[in-house]
Amino acid sequence: MIQLKVPAHSAMDNNIEAEWASSESYDLDTWTVFIESLPYVKSARFVFMSSFKDVSYTLITFDSEEHKTWFILRYS
């Protein structure tokens, strides 16, 4: 399972940079996140453009870390 943590402070930008962090053995660089609908809607879709293919993720929850809010996105 792949999960990405996206800083929520960039939520209203047209695109944001997602630095990851995977629990699996994937070598992920910084991916650009394109917001297809409002990010605070749980059904919002995020498309991560990589050098080899396009991968769609769905926002599943919110989390708080060191007083910063993150979007937790899981591969679907």
Which residues are covered by each model-predicted region?
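Structured alpha/beta or helical-core interaction and ligand-binding surfaces enriched in interleaved
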Residues: 1-57
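Short, compact, well-ordered microdomains
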Residues: 49-76
